[in-house]
Amino acid sequence: MAGENVLASVGPKDRSVRGLGLFVRLSPMKPVDEIEALVARVGTHPVYGYAHCMRVHALAEDLAAEEEVSYDGEILRVAALLHDIGLYKAYAMREPADHAKRSALVARRILQDWDFPPQASQAVIEAIELHPPGVPGSTASETILLKDAIGLDYLGAIGVSRMLAMVGTEDDVPDIRTAIWNAESLRQKIPDLLVLQASKDLAARRIREMEDFFEDLRDATEKLKLL
C-alpha cells in the first residue's frame, strides 16, 4: 500500500506502523494521546481533518451529558479521532470505496500496532464503520453519540462552512452553487437521521441558522444566479 512517509515526532521511542507507509516516534504518553498527536499531524483535510474530529468529539460528549448517556470515554475519543483517517493523504488509500470501511481498516492497524485492548479496539472499529448518519447497526452508546455528532457537524454555520471548503477540493463540488445545493440537501436529510432528542433539538437551532443564511444569500445574488 503506497503512502507518503509522515513523521509524527511525539517522543523518543521509535516504532513503525505496519503496512501504512507511516513512521511514528512514540512516547510514554497514553495510546489515545499518541493517536491524537498523529491525527493532529496528518489530519490536514479542510473538511474531514483534525478540527472536525475534535468538534465531533466535544459535541458527542455534550450530547451524552445532556441525555445522561453512559459511555466509554476512551472508545468515543479514539473513534472520533480516527473515523475519517482513511481519507487522509498520508495513507494514500483508494480501496475500499466506502470511506468508513477504509478508515476502519487503517484504524484497526493503528490500534493493533499500539497494543490497544482488543475489546476496546473492536468497539472503536464498529463505531467507525457505522459512523455515517443513516447507516443502520449498533445500539452501542459510543456509536450513536459519534453518528449524531457527525450529522450535526453538517448543519448550521459550521456545516455551510464545511460545504464551502469542499469547493475545488472535491470533484463533485466544483463551485459555490453546488456547495450551497449540497448544504441545503443535508439540511433536509440529516434531522431525520438523528437518534437522540438532544441531537434533534440542536439540529433545529442549526437549521434556523442555515435558513437565515440561505435567505440572505438568495437576496444578495438574485436567487443564486449571481453566485
Where are these regions (language model features)?
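Short, Lys/Arg-enriched N-terminal segments with co-localized hydrophobic residues
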Residues: 19-28
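His-Asp-centered metal-binding catalytic motifs of divalent-metal-dependent phosphohydrolases/nucleases
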Residues: 73-92, 99, 103, 107, ...
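Divalent metal-dependent phosphate-bond-processing catalytic cores, especially two-metal-ion Mg2+/Mn2+ enzymes
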Residues: 42-70, 82, 133-227
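Low-complexity, intrinsically disordered Ser/Thr/Pro- and acidic-rich segments
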Residues: 9-10, 18-20
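An amphipathic alpha-helix signature
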Residues: 32-36, 57, 61, 100-108, ...
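Active-site metal-coordination segments of metallo-dependent hydrolases
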Residues: 44-55, 89-102
